[in-house]
Each structure stands twice: as C-alpha cells, then as structure tokens.
Amino acid sequence: MDSFNPTTKTQAALTAALQAASAAGNPEIRPAHLLMALLTQADGIAAPLLEAVGVEPATIRAEAERMLARLPQASGASSQPQLSRESLAAITTAQHLATELDDEYVSTEHLMVGLATGDSDVAKLLTGHGASPQALREAFVKVRGSARVTSPDPEATYQALEKYSTDLTARAREGKLDPVIGRDNEIRRVVQVLSRRTKNNPVLIGEPGVGKTAIVEGLAQRIVAGDVPESLRDKTVIALDLGSMVAGAKYRGEFEERLKAVLDDIKNSAGQIITFIDELHTIVGAGATGEGAMDAGNMIKPMLARGELRLVGATTLDEYRKYIEKDAALERRFQQVFVGEPSVEDTVGILRGLKDRYEVHHGVRITDSALVAAATLSDRYITARFLPDKAIDLVDEAASRLKMEIDSRPVEIDEVERLVRRLEIEEMALAKEEDEASKERLEKLRSELADQKEKLAELTTRWQNEKNAIDVVRELKEQLETLRGESDRAERDGDLAKAAELRYGRIPEVEKKLEAALPQAEARENVMLKEEVGPDDIAEVVSAWTGIPAGRMLEGETAKLLRMEDELGKRVVGQKRAVQAVSDAVRRARAGVADPNRPTGSFMFLGPTGVGKTELAKALADFLFDDKRAMVRIDMSEYGEKHSVARLVGAPPGYIGYDQGGQLTEAVRRRPYTVILFDEIEKAHPDVFDVLLQVLDEGRLTDGQGRTVDFRNTILILTSNLGSGGSEEQVMAAVRSAFKPEFINRLDDVIIFHGLEPGELVQIVDIQLAQLQKRLAQRRLTLEVSLPAKQWLAHRGFDPVYGARPLRRLVQQAIGDQLAKQLLAGQVHDGDTVPVNVSPDGDSLILG
C-alpha cells in the first residue's frame, strides 16, 4: 500500500467510511461502509456507474444500509476502527486496476470494481444485481470515456456534458420548448453556416428580447422533426452552461480541466454535437485568473478554426462590439447572423403560436384581440424594450393577474362574510341582555343573520362551481397538450400503432370533452369570475408599467375630457385660447387621432408676467394626474451657458457625472407620461434649442449614454416674456428675432396671453381665497368674504404691469396677516366662521 495514491473523492470516501464506522461503534471498516460512502457522495461517480450497468443505485443503497444495521458493535472501544480484511483487499484490487489502466491516481470507479471483486457480502450483493467487476470495467467508457486519471479530481470531468450543459434536442422531443413561429430566414442562415467545412460557427447578434435563443430552440425542434439538410440530421444541440462550469472551481486549473473535458467529449462525438452558448461574450475572460491567463475564449479558438467544434453563439450588439470584436482572432472564427426586431404583424403571429401554452399554464382564455393589443400597445408605449419579448411579457402578466383573481375570494363573498362576522358578535352581546327591547332586537338580528348566512352559502357555492368549471377546462387542455406531445414522439420513434391510438382515439375523445366543457364554462350568467384576457387587461398592465393611460376611456373620463376647458378655466382666468389649445391636444391623444410619432402637444406661451402661463401648466398636470407636482419644471435661466446643455441630456463619456444621466432625459425615462414646463425659455443658451428640435419633431432624444428617450407621451410647454406689453405683431416679431425659424416651425402653437382685464380680477380673487380656505380647513375655519370685500381686493390688487401676482400678496397681507394675529391672541378659535368686510373708511378689510 506504499504507492496508494487516492483521488480527492476516494480519500473523502475513506474518511466518510471511517467516521460512519466510528459513529456506529463498529470495530472495523467493512466494505458496506465504503459502498455507502461512495453512494452518498455529492457529484459522485458510483451511482452513474451502477446506472450504466443497469442497476438501480437506490436498491443497492437500501441493501447496504441493512448490512450496516446487522454489523456487530463494540461499546467502550476508544481506538479508531481499522480496515477489515475484505476492505483492504478491495483497496488493493483498486490499486492494481489503476496501475493496469495506466492511471496515476486511484479513483472511486477503481474502488467500486475492488468492492465488487472477491467473496465479501458487498461483492456478492453487487454481482448478484448484475454489477460484476467485468461489467463495471466495461461501463468505464460510458462514464469517463477513454481519458486516463491524471489529476486528483478527475470525477469533475466525468460525464462533463451532462453536468455542464442542457440537451435542447431532448427537451424538444419531450415538448418542453415553446413553438418558434417565423424566423425562417435566420434559421436557414444558421443551418447554412453550420453546414460549412470550417468556421462553421454562426453567432446570432441582436437586441435583447428579439428572439435569439428562440432561433436555436427552433433549430433543435427542426432537427427532431427531421426538417434539416442531411448534414444536420440526427445531430444533438446542447446549451453550454459556463456559470455552472466556473461555480465551485476552487483551484487554478480546475475550470480549464472541466472545459477541456467538455471539449474532448464534443470532439469525440465526431461532429454529432452542435454547441450553443447563450451570452457568448462571457467566454472572453471566463476562468481567467490574472494577466495573460488562459480563458475559455482562448481555449476554444483552435477547435473553432479547425471546424472540430460547431458553436452557435448569441449575444447583443453592444456586448459583441465590447468583447468579441476586440479579439480579432476570435471574431474571424464566427459568422455573424443579424436578428432584427420583428414587426407588429409578425409579433401577433408569434403570440398566436404561444397562446395555447400560456392558456394551459394560467388556466385562462386569451382572446385574439388581447394578442393584437399586446403587440400594438407594447410597440407604442414600451419603447426601451424590444418585440416580441415585451409583448409576450404583457400577455403573461395580464394572464397571471387574472389567474390570481380567480384563485382569490371574490369581493362579494368577502363583504357578506364580514357582515356575518359582525352580526354574530352583535348576537353574542345581545344574548346577555334581559330587557324586552334587546330580546326583540335579538330576534330581528337572528333573522337577518340567517338570511346573510344563506346568501354567503349561495355565493360560495356559485364561486366554487365557477372555479371548478374553469379548472375542468384547464385540466382538459393540459391533458390534450400532453397527448399531442406523446403522439408526436410516438410518430418520430416509428411507433405508429401508439401514434394512431392517440391521434384517432384518445385525442378526439379529450377534444370532445373540452368542446362540451367550454360552452358550460362560457354560458354562465352573472359570473363572479372573469376568465378571459381581453385588450383592457393588456392596457391595464401597460398603464401599471408606464403610467400612461393606454386603456379604453371609461364614461367618467370621457365626460371629464369633454369639459376640460371648464376645469382648467377654474384655475386660469381670461386665457380661453390657451386653455382651448391645450385641451384639444389632450383629447386628440386620448382619442387616438394624434400623430403617434410626435409629442402629445408642444406650445409656446407668450405674454407679460403674472397672467397664468405657468399656472396653466400646473393646472394641466393637476387635471391629468390629480397631482400638480407631476410636472417636470425646468427653469431655463439655469441653462444660460453653453456647457449647461449637458445637464439636460447628461454628460458625454469621459466627463464627471457621465453615469448620472440628464435632468430632462432621466425625468422622462422614469415618468414617460408627463407635462414638461420650460420656464422663461428666452433666458437659455441658443444651443439648448438645438437639443429641443429633435424632441419637438420626432418625439425622442438621445441622452449622454446613447439611450433613446421617448417624449411621445409628453406635453411640452415653453413660456417666455418676450415682447410683453406690445401688440401681437410686435410680440411675434420679437419671437422671430430670438428663435430660429426651424424651432418655431416645430411647435404646435404659439399662444399669446393677454393682460388681465379689471373684470377678470374678481374671479382670480375667488381662486386666491379658495386656496387660503384650503389651508385653513385643517383648523375647521371658514371665511365669509362679502362681495364689497372681493371688489376691494380686485381693485387694490390690479396692476397691469405685474398681472395677478400682486393680488396674491394683497390677500396674504389684508386677510392672512390679520387672521394670524387673531388666532394667536385667542380672538378666533378652531371651527369659527370669520366674516370679512370693508372698513368704514374703505382703506382696509375688517375680520370679525
């Protein structure tokens, strides 16, 4: 035993056997201890070796446990258990076998053969079940191939393909892959490249979510169906998992050893295996431990060039440029196959192909109009992602929402249940009372409780019946899908009798049951459970993701939009044309008649200070979002220098703040449906207007990091004081001299706000008083302002130069200041009504 050189796993098995014998109080380490240690090893080779000779490892393990239970125990023995004669013989046999096979280490498979040799109880057990020494030796090739054991951890390289990859063709045979619709040109191009003699390595390049991985799954399905040229017939497509290959590689060289084992297996398959690596850029640098170290990319280069490894890669445009193109030697070994984003029409076709899978998974019905809505709405509103992925996600989430509602108790049942609980508590309280009134009330309450319990039972039964009907349909659909998969498998395997029995017997039978169950599920009246995904459900998900109201307008919202001028007019006085223009823009967008490739509206508001330009933008945000803060306000006076343009869209690469994004672009990316106010636009540097040209015309803007930000659901309002006080012609002349023609030409409308008339001031007084009243509501104070007092405020607060702002200050001074003093002095208390009148001399207002 001087030359005994065990692998890490063999040493671990011997240690585990020693510990097990010691814990059980056995004086000797018997072959049964060694066998149990080998069978219970994580990632051990004993179980696969037994399976390779047709023996069930669980059976052997159960027998070994019974043997261990019968072993003698020595109590009080302090010394460690020693190897028994049979165990020593097994280890010696393993050592001789390793020498015979020219292996440098005694591996666990050598030890398994040693345990099966001789006349020990374990040897009889293994041989009796068919795991004879000769059978186990013949199985070596299946498990470890023709490789010699030259490292202390060879087990990590055994069955490397099974450990570190997924067989896509096997998954396709089992029907576990989603159907691939379209993409014929891309699959044909992949097949052409794979059929080459050398450099037969296509790399699928495209944006995330366009279906690169699906193309490889489509190839696997075609190979299984036999719909490929002779050169690819009966080939196996495996998806390599580099993550699991790197995971747990503790020592330098361990990752390379695993990868080499996988590559050797692929090489030995003589071209039968096509390898797929998703996220191909991960091979660059994978497993490298320092400068100049070998990584996965460098290890596979020679095989790629010689055509020994047929590799299909998939990666995005950015990552291909960043990682693969940098390594020219690696890039030249790949043939690029560009995968573009499918059109909306193609996406609808893809969704129709996937519809059955999602219906079976969620147990709901998905209407065709929902699929069309998913494709169109995702294309229109979810701009940062790509079809068909974003459309599939919409359908999936809408269906999962509906499934969650079906599984939850309906609101009607919840309400009745709470009422029953409340009545039961009342009943218990009244039962303790002795007076006649309480007894009479108790009788009425019991009658009501009985009615409500009956109603609850009826509702629960109805809900349960509806749920059962939906479950029956789902189970039948699952059954049908399983049978169709079995039928396809039987046909491929040439079992025509089974295929005929399924296709003409069991499948029509289940289809008939489904046809009978569907009308029953659909014909219910006053349904409690909705089981159909429609366009409105898709629109709800879009709204939840983006905040954009994409759904059909409800009656309440329609009425609200039709009277939009009245609502905005309550806040902005005397500017009918501006209110009309903004209202028309919002209605066009919500009715779907606006140009989808431009912002909802873009306006320039001109006029003197204090006439309501900024107030209209706030009122619009308040109207649309019920929150006046839901507005991006950019004070253009802060953008007077040339370099400040970078603050709007984000600093370019190489500058400080590059990773932070721009103030305008980031605000719109986070909230794509918003009002953007560019206040005092004339104070900005002229270069800022060049940035806005693209927004006004195309509805998009590229930020400092190269991302396109969508402005198509925003309303842009630019305010300016240019030419204020002049005539309309003078104002427009000032605008034309300050802004370039291409900038003015891209605006929807240039609206001139007129100075306020004295008659309009009373309405503004009402607005200012209403705002003050809202602040006083917390103290339950009510102001009663007389008409003369309002007229006094309007007269004193009017200033044609400064607009309505002096009026706000006057309300604060004449009413707010007096009221504050009276509250502090205790003259006015919470809940009081405070009258406001003009003083006898007409110089001030009197409170109280």
Curated annotation (Swiss-Prot):
UniProt keyword list: ATP-binding, Chaperone, Coiled coil, Cytoplasm, Nucleotide-binding, Repeat, Stress response
NBD1: annotated span: 159-341
Positions contributing to ATP 2 binding: 607-614
Short name of one Pfam family: AAA_lid_9
Region (Linker): 342-547
GO MF annotation terms: ATP binding; ATP hydrolysis activity
Top-level lineage group: Bacteria
GO cellular component, one term: cytoplasm
Location of region: NBD2: 557-755
Region (Repeat 1): 6-71
PROSITE patterns in alphabetical order: CLP_R, CLPAB_1, CLPAB_2
Compartment annotation: Cytoplasm
SUPFAM superfamilies per record: Double Clp-N motif, P-loop containing nucleoside triphosphate hydrolases
Region of interest: C-terminal: 756-848
Residues reported in the UniProt entry to bind ATP 1: 206-213
The keyword Nucleotide-binding is annotated on this UniProt entry: yes
Coiled coil (residue ranges): 392-526
Spans annotated as Repeat 2: 83-146
Residue ranges of domain Clp R in the record: 1-146
UniProt xrefs under NCBIfam families: chaperone_ClpB (TIGR03346)
Subunit field text: Homohexamer. The oligomerization is ATP-dependent.
Domain comment, as recorded: The Clp repeat (R) domain probably functions as a substrate-discriminating domain, recruiting aggregated proteins to the ClpB hexamer and/or stabilizing bound proteins. The NBD2 domain is responsible for oligomerization, whereas the NBD1 domain stabilizes the hexamer probably in an ATP-dependent manner. The movement of the coiled-coil domain is essential for ClpB ability to rescue proteins from an aggregated state, probably by pulling apart large aggregated proteins, which are bound between the coiled-coils motifs of adjacent ClpB subunits in the functional hexamer.
Name of the protein in question: Chaperone protein ClpB
Species name: Mycolicibacterium paratuberculosis (strain ATCC BAA-968 / K-10)
Gene from which this protein is expressed: clpB
